[in-house]
Structure formats: C-alpha cells, structure tokens
Amino acid sequence: FYVILPLQYFLVAIDWFSMFTIFIPVYGFLFLPILSALLGDPAHFLDRSTKIQWALMISVFCISHIPALLTLDISGYEGKNLLLMIFLILVVQSSDVLQYVWGKLFGEHKIAPTLSPSKTVEGFVGGVLSASLLGMLLHWLTPFSAWQAFLMSLLICLMGFLGGLVMSAMKRSMGVKDWGNMISGHGGILDRMDSLCF
C-alpha cells in the first residue's frame, strides 16, 4: 500500500496516462493478494484482500484522477487546467451542501433509508439540479459551453451522489458512522471527499 500510493501519484506527475489508469486496477489488484498469500496467513485472506483493494481504489486510484486533470491537453485551454479541477471540486462539494439544505427544508421521502437515513428524494433532486445550474454559471472556468457545463455537472453530481451511497454502504458494513473525527460533526477527510471519489 505504501509503495503503491507514491507510485500512482508519480505516474500522474509524469503524465503516463496509460499506466496510471491501469496500475492499481490491474497490477495492484494482482500483486497485493499474491503478496498477502506469500506471507502465509490464510486467516481472513479474502476479507483482508477485499478491504485493501477497496481502500486502494477509493483513497488512491479514484482521488488521483483529480490532479490528473492538470495533465490534460485541451486545445485552446492550455495553462488553465487548474480551473477545471476547481470547477470539479466546487460543483461536487456544492452538490453535497445543497442536497443537505434542500433535504432539511423540503425533505420528506427517504431515498436510501438503510444506507443514509438523512438523504431524501427532495434533497437529492434539489441539490443535484442546483449544483448543475451552478456548474452552468461557472462554465467560464472550463473549456465547455454553458449547456455542456450543465450536463457535465449533472453527470458529476449524479455520480457523486451514487459514490456517497457506496461509501455509506461500506461504512454500514464495517459498523462505523464516519471515516474519522478530524472535522467536528462531519467525520473525517474521506467523509468530505466521498462524492469526489466517484
């Protein structure tokens, strides 16, 4: 794990796109279970391997695609890739906040009560649409037209919501409410970034 983390970001930094997109899902997922098996402790092997692979996928592989935006070569957008990264983070984080606000104000129908009891249909729809409109207004940060930015934001927000549900399912499976307590009342860093992972 401690070798794969810096290697993944090194591959991003040197802009070796074809390798950083397959390094963890192919090589990491292949060699980590082999290493675990060679260590000779078969007790809970499958459980341990699964947790390591999910940890790599979520906290390293998925997140590493955010700084990878800096390496994209977009014609007519040279030197502005940081703005694309800022756009992504603003849209995703505003979607989370706006879903919470819409849910508190108008939420009545639970969307996934066993995974995340506070999430509502009204919060989801209001938050996703509001954040997508924000993305449309922020299209000037991107190489996209206003409508392209809206559609991109809509897709980003939908995937972020689904990512949040996946992370909630993982937490419920492990019997924890939050990934940490670094941010008082809001859990850990990964709790704030779960939507960005997807």
Predicted regions and their residues:
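Acidic (Asp/Glu-rich) catalytic motifs at the cytosolic membrane interface
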Residues: V92-E108, A112, V121-V125, L158-C197
